[in-house]
Structures are given as C-alpha cells and as structure tokens.
Curated annotation (Swiss-Prot):
Its EC number is 2.4.2.29. This is Queuine tRNA-ribosyltransferase. Binds 1 zinc ion per subunit. Keywords: Glycosyltransferase, Metal-binding, Queuosine biosynthesis, Transferase, tRNA processing, Zinc. Belongs to the queuine tRNA-ribosyltransferase family. The keyword Transferase applies. Its cofactor is Zn(2+).
Length: 378
C-alpha cells in the first residue's frame, strides 16, 4: 500500500529521485508539498493545485481539531471528500503548533494541556489523542506526536524533549489502528548533532513507512540548519521517504535535496502572496514597488502557470496596490507553481545524472544581487 522506490541516486551528492506510492496516488520526489492548514491551501482550489503540479498536500491536525473538529470531517468521508482533493494528503500531529502557538500550555510525559485560542477551552492532547484525530481526518500520511524544542534551548531541555519524543513515538505506534495510513516518525534533537544521531538511531529500528526531520527552521541560523539536515538525513533508511518539515525556500531545499531529503512543505508561497510578493527564480519581488507599475512583461516569462501566461507585472502590481482579492489568488498560483517546478527540475537533474552541475548553478544564482535592491534571496 505504501512503498518508496529510489529510481536514481546522484554520484556526487546524497540526492536521489524516487516514487512514493500511497493509496491516493504516487508522489514523484523530490517534491514540494503545499500547506492547507484548515483543509484548504489559502486562496487556491484543488484545480489550481493540480495545475500547479501539486501531488501531495498538507493539512493541520491542531487547527482542524479546533475547527471544525475531526468528527465533522470524518462524517463527510474524511479529508479527501471534505476538501475535494483526490491526491495524497499528509497531516501533522499538531505538536509544533501546540508548542509554538498555544499559550498557557503544560507539558508532561502524558501529553500537553493547552488553552484553545478560539474559546479559551482547556484541551488535552496526548500521543494517543493525536493519532485518533488523524485517523478520523483520514490522511494518507500521519505524523507521530513529538515535542519540538524552541531555539534557543539548553542542551538539557533538548535532551528531555528528545527522550519524550521517543516515548511518545512508541505510544503512537501502539495507538495506531488504521492500516491504510502511513505513520512517519519525527527526528528531534535541536541543534545538537549527537542528539539528532541518537534520536534517529533509536527510531530507525521501528521500520516505519517514512521519517521526518523536525525542529528545524525555528529561528536557528541557516548555516546550523543545513548542518543538522546534512548530519541527520543520511542516518535515515534509504528505502523510506525522508521529509524535512517546514522548509521551502529554494536554497534550503536545494541543500536538503543534496543531503538526501525527498519531501518538503512550507507556508511561504501563499503567505508571501498575501503580502503582495512573488517568488521569481528564487528571489522575492515586492509588487508594490514602483518599478512594476508600467512593467508589462509576464511575471516570469519562463513559468507556464496561469498567472504568468495571462497577466502582466503591471496588472498584478495594480491588484496588489488596490488590495483586490484576486491578487492573492494569482500570486499564490505562481508562487506554489514556482516551488513545485524547482523540485521537479531538481528531480529531472538527478534522473539525468547532472544534479551536481544543477546544484552548483543554483548555488551561484541564489545570491542577492546588489544591483537589485528589491530582490531578496529565498
């Protein structure tokens, strides 16, 4: 039911191209996955996502538990029916949101107690509860409940969080009942390479369908994040998909792909769109800038998305300045397409045994051009 097939490995890096088979379709890796927090990728329909090349998307356990509630989703036939998406879906366990968003939380070995930001209700979330919610939601891939330590955090605090994550993984495995869902473990360990290694080595014997690297991109310097990913990814089974959570910029994905990572997710394409920004060839363009007001070129002439085929930079700039809702949809279409196309290009380069050259070219390109003050590196 779930199988990862490695099609090609890079001779010079750890990069690999593969196929991840799920009950709702196959995901060609490396692949960027759009984030649909509340069972929708903001401003986009399933048809938009398909046209952008999306194969698997995410939904958020924490937020869906709070609203509308997993019982309502289950009564609709699960997430696929509820949101009208026929492809694979991944749900996170809610751990990251509990630890990063919730106030007045209390953490113990049993789980987490926190106050709902919607109505102030006290909510308890345990490993067993996280699995039960995800089974009701019905995604293809579900994530183990973990404790995500903040950055910075003391070594002692990270040790405790890592040990608790391992204990909670065991409970998630015992609690899981549905055979049509793949449970992924999440490797923690903060910025400490030895703790990452210990956590990964403790998780691998469970022989789960996939493994994720969590607790990165939480405020640590990019250099440290890349080092942690480079250390952790090779420790994970070669015949299972590797998922880097919450990462989705060009440079981050490029280096993670070179380290052997297969799957990525991030809210950045739609979040930037809602702020009037486009991602173009790895750079961030603020379309409120005056230089776009009379620029009648496509946003990116090389991009095949609906936005780039149909509208000019000047028109998009006008929509952004006027705060027209259409701007957010059109920019989201392009930004999601841009990140998916980038991972598709990396995959093709791996298959054609030219990834090392591809990576070197993009490494050189992904530098802020001093002559382009409106461009920011992504």
């Amino acid at each position: 039911m779930f199988e990862f097939v490695c099609q090609q490995e890079c001779a010079h890096t750890q990069a690999r191209a593969g196929l991840f088979h799920t009950p709702h379709g196959t995901v060609a890796t490396p692949r960027f996955m759009p984030v649909g927090t509340l069972a929708n990728v903001k401003t986009l329909t399933p048809e938009h996502l398909k046209a952008a090349g999306a194969q698997m998307i995410l939904a958020n356990t924490y937020h869906l538990h709070l609203q509308p509630g997993e019982d309502i989703v289950a009564a609709a036939g699960g997430l696929h029916c509820f949101m009208g998406w026929s492809g694979p879906i991944l749900t996170d366990s809610g751990g990251f949101q509990v630890f990063s968003l919730s106030e007045m939380r209390q953490i113990s070995d049993q789980g987490v107690v926190f106050r709902s930001p919607h109505d102030g209700q006290i909510i308890e979330l345990s490993p067993e509860g996280a699995i039960a919610i995800q089974e009701a939601l019905g995604a293809d891939v579900i994530m183990a409940f973990d404790e995500c330590p903040p950055y910075p955090a003391s070594r002692e605090a990270v040790i405790q969080a890592t040990q608790r994550t391992l204990q909670w993984l065991e409970r998630c495995i015992v609690a899981k009942q549905r055979s049509d869902q793949a449970l992924f473990a999440i490797v923690q360990g903060g910025v400490y390479a030895d703790l990452r290694r210990e956590c990964a080595e403790a998780m691998v014997p469970y022989d789960l369908p996939g493994y994720a690297i969590g607790g990165v991109s939480v405020g640590e310097p990019n250099r440290i994040m890349h080092e942690i990913v480079a250390v952790t990814a090779p420790l994970l089974p070669v015949h299972k998909p590797r998922y880097l959570m919450g990462v989705g910029t060009h440079l981050e994905m490029l280096r993670a792909i070179a380290a052997g990572v297969d799957l990525f997710d991030c809210v950045i394409p739609t979040r930037l769109a809602r702020h009037g920004c486009a991602i173009v060839q790895g750079q961030r363009w603020n379309l409120k800038n005056a230089r776009f007001r009379r620029d009648y070129e496509p946003l990116d002439p090389t991009c095949p998305c609906y936005t780039c085929r149909t509208f000019s930079r000047a028109y998009l700039s006008h929509l952004v300045r006027a705060k027209e809702l259409l701007a957010y949809t059109l920019l989201s279409i392009h930004n999601v397409t841009e990140l998916i196309r980038f991972t598709q290009a990396a995959r093709q380069a791996i298959l054609e045994e030219r990834f090392a050259a591809f990576a070197a070219e993009w490494e050189q390109r992904l530098v802020v051009d001093a002559e382009e003050p409106d461009a920011a590196l992504l």
